[in-house]
Amino acid sequence: DYETEKLSFNGRECNLNPDPAQIRNDISCLVSYLSSLNSFYGDVQQAQRDYYAFMNWYFASLFMPYLRYMANKNSYEVTLFPVVGIIYGESNGGKSTFLRMLSKLMCNAKIPLNATSDFSASNIEKLRCGCEGVPLNIDDLDKDQFRNHSGRIIKDDVWGIAEHFIN
């Protein structure tokens, strides 16, 4: 709740002033994960930069609906605040593990990854409304499923604005 400066998840109020030891533990997890990419092949430094950029978007994504609403209200471009993030890469590259870690760090809960069949305009609409701004994580998205539905999902620049959907 932006006005009362309180955050709740599944009806439970979250502590917005976490214990410094927990913060250090979370940072240690992130550093350990990003360092583990050193054993991968290819452009490791670019992969680390990409994962770091995605991580920052992921944590900020909770605020994107509100930022989009305020941008629209004040005649700014809503596409500056994307509500869709995509990680693409080779199989067994650690993407699913990365998403599980991010959702655990963000919500202090294990949030299941969605199936490729959830990636359709109608399913995504229902999931978005129910997830209160928490990112949807679709695991191993099938290329045909992506090709058939991505345009309507990714290019939906006005989603949630008219409904004042701000989490």
Question: Where in this protein do the model-derived segments appear?
Answer:
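Extended, charged/polar low-complexity intrinsically disordered regions
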Residues: 1-48, 65
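Conserved NTP-binding/hydrolysis core of motor NTPases
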Residues: 66-167
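N-terminal pre-Walker A segment at the start of P-loop NTPase domains
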Residues: 46-73
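Hydrophobic core segments within long, regular secondary-structure runs in both alpha-
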Residues: 27-31, 55, 159, 163
